[in-house]
Structure formats: structure tokens, C-alpha cells
A protein has these predicted regions:
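P-loop NTP-binding catalytic core
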Residues: 88-102
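Conserved alpha-helical substructure of the radical SAM core
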Residues: 124-153
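Short linear Ser/Thr-Pro motifs
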Residues: 75, 108-109, 122, 192, ...
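Conserved AdoMet/S-adenosylmethionine-binding subsite of the radical SAM
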Residues: 144-320
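Auxiliary Fe-S-binding modules of radical SAM enzymes
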Residues: 1-92, 244-253, 258-345
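Generic beta-strand structural signal
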Residues: 80, 92, 103-107, 115, ...
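Canonical Radical SAM [4Fe-4S] cluster-binding loop centered on the CxxxCxxC motif
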Residues: 98-135
Length: 345
């Protein structure tokens, strides 16, 4: 008997091929998919409309992604942060945020991260491995079952670079938006990237109706390379044209993420440079007051400075908003809870 497959990783088409390969009718695949991704079961024995012989086969050949909540923190504003332990013992973070329009879950896509952004806690120990499609989906299901509340929006902005785990993330998006599952529409999904240009072009060809959020954080190469080593491989001269191509190909407006760092990227000169860089794109800029990270040389810009920067951008014709800060009284920085757990705090 070979290694078991994680049945949660299979898209409906892949699951159908697998079930038919077991000599079962196609409709069984749709039933099983619903058990996994709509009813959110984590045991084959819970699939009460399936033949016992098939369940025995599945039990023998397959597993179901079912992370365990290792730590749970709840903020005064209702934000819930989870440290989830995977089947192999690795841990990831997932955050549920409550808004007036519904609940958003921020998912991780890798265990650790290889991108090395210097203001981010999740990259400090490097990348361990990619998450599978089913493991990413299970983050949402775990939060939904824990709170008893429906999740309506997803942001792929947790630990890891989604486009560095491209194929698994594409399968996850297909699973999560499938009408036979939790059926979260693409327009309710945001995917964040630090700027892997070839993968942005590959994503554009898929014409998905999600929102692409590009972690920009600086409007010139010198500053950006100091904050984000990925800029050495894909400088702004490559990244911004890729963003323009993406908008043209998909018809979807890009959002630029801009973490405000005191004395680094928060001056009026930087606002002018940023406006010039993205001129004519009609893009949205999301200004983010950074969370403090142990061991990082960076500190957050004060609120007055953030709002001054926002007003300067708007005066220059750039649509800019300040991200609402949630979970500030818990280990809110991405990767911080996982790091604290590893250090035994």
C-alpha cells in the first residue's frame, strides 16, 4: 500500500476521476465533495449516504485534512487568531476578522515563507513547505466550525507567498468557489503577492475575478530592495508593467499594499513618487500601519502621518484608504503567534 492521498486536495473533477477509478458511479464524487467541502466532515464514517465498501476503500487509501487548534486568541474587536497544527506537526496561522458585511478569513498558503521581507515575522524562520489545497481550505472550515459563523470572504495574506505555491493555490481557489462546496465567489477573494512577475502573468491568463493585491511598500527600487529582497529579482521596471498587463488582461483593478514604516517610506516625497509610479492605472492603494515585530529594525508610522500620507496621495489623484487595524491586542503581526509558540512563549 502506497502513501495515502489527502482527498481534501482534490478538485471536483479530480475527485470524480478518482472515484470512477474505484469502479463507482460519477454521482458519488459529488456526494463526497459535498461532505468534505459543504458539510465539513473530517471522518469518512460521517458520510452516511455512501456504501460501506466504498467508505472502507477511502479509509484505507485516503486522509482528510483536519488541522487541530493548538492556540486560539480572541481580540476585543472580535478578531480570532488561530495557531493550527497540521498532520505532520507543522503549525500555521489563520485569522478570522468580523466586518459589517460578513466574516473574512485570512489564510496561510505555506509553512513559513522564503521571500525574506524584513518587516514580516512569518519569514524569519524561512519556508518549510507548501500547504496543499485541502490544508488551505481546512483553515476556513476550522474557523467556520469553531465560531459557528459563515465565512463570506477570503484573503490569501497569511504566512507564505501564494504565487510561490501556485498550483496548490489554484486548486484551492477551484475547490473553495465550487457550487458544490462552500461556494465563496471569486469577487469575495483577495490574493496577495510580493511581486513574482512570471506568476502574475500566469495568473492573468486564468481570468479569475478575484482581487490581486500587490505588496508594493515602496515607490523606488533602493527603498523596496531594502525592505523586500524579491525586488532584486523583479524590480519595479518589471513589476509595474506586469500589473498593467494583469489589469488589461482581466479587467480587474489591482490593489497595492503599502506598509507605512517610520522614516523609510512615509515622506511627502515618497507619496509623490508613488503617485507617479502608478499613474493612469486607476489602482487602489491600501495603507497599512505595520505591527511591531521582534527583531525587525522597522517601527510603525504614527496615525497622523498615515492620514497625512493618504491625503497627499488623494490630492495627487490616487485612491487610497487606511486599513482598519484589527486584533491589535493579540499577536496580530503575521507569523508572530507561530514564532512565539516555537519559542515556548
Amino acid at each position: 500500500m502506497g502513501e495515502k492521498i489527502c482527498i481534501s486536495d482534490l478538485t471536483l473533477d479530480a475527485l470524480t476521476a478518482y472515484i470512477v477509478g474505484l469502479g463507482q458511479p460519477k454521482f458519488r464524487a459529488k456526494q463526497i465533495f459535498k461532505w468534505l467541502h459543504q458539510k465539513l466532515v473530517t471522518e469518512f464514517s460521517q458520510m452516511t449516504d455512501q456504501p460501506k465498501a466504498l467508505l472502507a476503500q477511502l479509509e484505507e487509501q485516503c486522509t482528510i485534512a483536519a488541522p487541530v487548534i493548538r492556540r486560539r486568541q480572541q481580540s476585543r474587536d472580535g478578531t480570532v487568531k488561530y495557531l493550527l497544527q497540521l498532520a505532520d506537526g507543522n503549525c500555521i496561522e489563520t485569522v478570522l476578522m468580523r466586518y459589517k458585511y460578513g466574516n473574512t478569513v485570512c489564510v496561510s498558503t505555506q509553512v513559513g515563507c522564503a521571500m525574506g521581507c524584513r518587516f514580516c515575522a512569518s519569514t524569519q524562520a524561512g519556508r518549510v513547505r507548501d500547504l496543499t489545497a485541502g490544508e488551505i481550505a481546512a483553515e476556513i472550515y476550522t474557523a467556520q466550525k469553531d465560531t459557528g459563523e459563515r465565512v463570506s470572504h477570503i484573503v490569501l495574506m497569511g504566512i507564505g507567498e501564494p504565487l510561490h505555491n501556485f498550483n496548490n493555490v489554484m486548486d484551492f481557489l477551484e475547490i473553495i468557489s465550487c457550487s458544490e462546496g462552500v461556494n465563496i465567489g471569486m469577487r469575495n477573494i483577495s490574493l496577495s503577492t510580493c511581486g513574482l512577475v512570471p506568476k502574475i502573468d500566469e495568473l492573468a491568463k486564468r481570468h479569475l475575478q478575484l482581487t490581486l493585491s500587490v505588496s508594493l511598500h515602496a515607490p523606488d527600487n533602493k527603498t523596496r530592495s531594502g525592505m523586500m529582497p524579491v525586488n532584486d529579482a523583479f524590480p519595479l521596471e518589471q513589476l509595474i508593467p506586469a500589473c498593467r498587463r494583469y489589469q488589461k488582461e482581466t479587467g480587474r483593478r489591482i490593489s497595492f499594499e503599502y506598509s507605512m514604516v517610520r522614516g523609510v517610506n512615509d515622506s511627502s516625497e515618497m507619496a509623490q513618487k508613488l503617485a507617479n509610479l502608478i499613474k493612469g492605472m486607476g489602482a487602489h492603494v491600501n495603507l497599512i500601519p505595520i505591527n511591531p515585530v521582534d527583531g525587525s529594525p522597522y517601527s510603525a508610522t504614527d496615525d497622523a502621518n498615515v492620514h497625512r500620507f493618504q491625503k497627499e496621495l488623494e490630492a495627487l489623484g490616487v485612491n487610497a484608504t487606511v486599513r482598519r487595524r484589527l486584533g491589535t491586542d493579540i499577536s496580530a503581526a503575521c507569523g508572530q503567534l507561530r514564532r512565539e509558540d516555537a519559542q515556548g512563549k
